[in-house]
């Protein structure tokens, strides 16, 4: 029975890693839509998001089967709980990346209000966070999980800078308001992706250490 449980745990862990990997694949495509006006790539982002949704449903069913069949305890139970609780976070990451791509496609229909320097930095940082998060989960690496949390603070700071800049643009010329508000929404979507990554990172830490401190 122990061997069967370990095999099932490896399978759902790999599934969660693959689900995170799918979101990670979405980020550069959404970046192309937003930063390089590649509205033609919006369909690819949506297609990847559908993969994320399907992965979520499959993993949720598998986690529930493991609980019913094996009744795991201690670290094994914490792993199943980590994955179950993180599925909605990862699914929401995908949704927010789709929102970024959709807004990017709409923004591409008119001249840019400004260069999207900080949005580009946010996207780059989120890609690093995702890579770091997957490694922390695969290797049970608390340090990488904590680094993911720290990187989210940088994403939050970039979002705050974007807000300040865009408020200035709106005050200077009311004609900028519509586009500035959409850019704020893009920034907010990216900030939320980081928040959901942080949630998963905190659960990885608890899984490994058994402590919430």
Swiss-Prot record:
Where does this one sit in the cell? Answer: Cytoplasm
Recorded GO molecular functions are:
protein homodimerization activity
GO cellular component labels: cytoplasm
Which top-level group of life is the source organism from?
A: Bacteria
One protein family per Pfam: PhoU
| Matching SUPFAM superfamilies | PhoU-like (SSF109755)
What are the UniProt keywords, alphabetically?
Cytoplasm, Phosphate transport, Transport
- NCBIfam families from the entry? phoU_full
| SUBUNIT field | Homodimer.
The entry's family comment says:
Belongs to the PhoU family.
Function in brief: Plays a role in the regulation of phosphate uptake.
Q: What is this protein called?
A: Phosphate-specific transport system accessory protein PhoU homolog
Q: Which species is this record about?
A: Deinococcus radiodurans (strain ATCC 13939 / DSM 20539 / JCM 16871 / CCUG 27074 / LMG 4051 / NBRC 15346 / NCIMB 9279 / VKM B-1422 / R1)
């Amino acid at each position: 029975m122990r061997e069967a449980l370990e095999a099932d745990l490896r399978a759902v862990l790999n599934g969660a890693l693959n689900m995170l990997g799918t979101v990670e694949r979405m980020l550069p495509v959404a970046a192309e839509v937003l930063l390089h006006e590649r509205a033609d790539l919006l369909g690819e982002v949506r297609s990847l998001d559908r993969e994320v949704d399907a992965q979520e449903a499959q993993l949720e069913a598998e986690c529930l089967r493991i609980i019913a069949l094996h009744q795991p305890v201690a670290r094994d139970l914490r792993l199943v709980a980590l994955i179950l609780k993180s599925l909605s976070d990862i699914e929401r990451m995908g949704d927010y990346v789709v929102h970024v791509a959709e807004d990017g496609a709409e923004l591409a229909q008119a001249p840019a209000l400004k260069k999207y320097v900080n949005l580009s930095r946010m996207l780059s940082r989120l890609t690093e966070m995702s890579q770091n998060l997957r490694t922390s989960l695969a290797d049970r690496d608390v340090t990488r999980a904590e680094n993911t949390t720290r990187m989210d603070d940088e994403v939050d700071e970039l979002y705050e800078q974007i807000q300040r800049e865009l408020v200035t643009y709106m005050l200077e010329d009311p004609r900028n308001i519509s586009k500035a508000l959409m850019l704020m929404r893009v920034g907010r979507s990216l900030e939320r992706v980081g928040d959901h990554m942080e949630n998963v990172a905190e659960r990885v830490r608890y899984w490994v250490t058994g402590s919430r401190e």
